[in-house]
Amino acid sequence: MEAPTYSSKQVAEMLGVSPKQIPEESRKDAYTPDDIWELRATLDRFPERLGHRRQLFLNFKGGTGKTSLSTSYAWRLAELGYAVLLIDLDSQGHATKCLGYEGEDFEKTLLDVLVRKTPLAKVIQKSSLPNLDFVPSNLTMSTVDLALMPMAGREFKLRNALKEVEAQYDVVVFDAPPSFGLLNLNALMAANDLFVPVLADFLSFHGLKLLFETVQSLEEDLNHVLDHVFIVVNSFNATFKLAKEALEALQTHYPEFLLPTIIRQCTKFAQASSEGRPVFVADPSSKGANDIQAMIDNVLPRLVAAAAAAPAKGNQQAG
């Protein structure tokens, strides 16, 4: 995907300034991502520190719009100035495609890291944003669960692989397949935060129940406690009575995990995915883009507060 360009209004919004605060000598009709990065340095407009977050987007139920959500979320965090690594865990390579790339074009995937001990740094690719990197996926990833099966410490392979690069990123985002196996177990064991995209239908409850049972077993058996679990209602259509009833049920049964932000049904998500572009590139003024920004606005203060409450841990990771 070619690098996008931005208007002065968009740039000012990303930097948290008014357009008039952009230095006159730096003003242009259109700005590239590199231009924006230079402006950040000039104006010293970097976002608040998050520590080093590892965030997993997962639902054992398919069809929840998880990949469109995770890739647009990662893209927007990068636009806002965070250093982001997006790791595609799905052998279908949909997250890779949403960034405008074909997984088959890459020789190495996470399989090489977890099974063949290739350093993660050798698999990481650059995107069209200077501060958004990604690990691609393709059909070779379909064998990773089987390959991990006989290995000692198999559930910790991903967590250990991240240690060599984690200090370079504010956020690592995992886009996981809708299944439970050793790869997703690795992702759960590596994650600080779990995002669970759900549809407002009653079929989602079964998947949620199974996922929360898995999270609880990780706490009890492997002593791994997630910092945050965020349930995100995706593709919501308020004109459907059943959708409203399902939302009310989610609010009743999962109030402590359910984000107040709702991602409304938006055709731009499907269009953007088919074009190999995040929704913030396809249509930055769409409902989908606005709702993901609202979700980020809701989540970031919690992450900033968590980082501030654990300075010793953050300093240790940064070193």
Stretches found by the model and what they are:
Residues 1-22:
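Polyanion-binding surface elements
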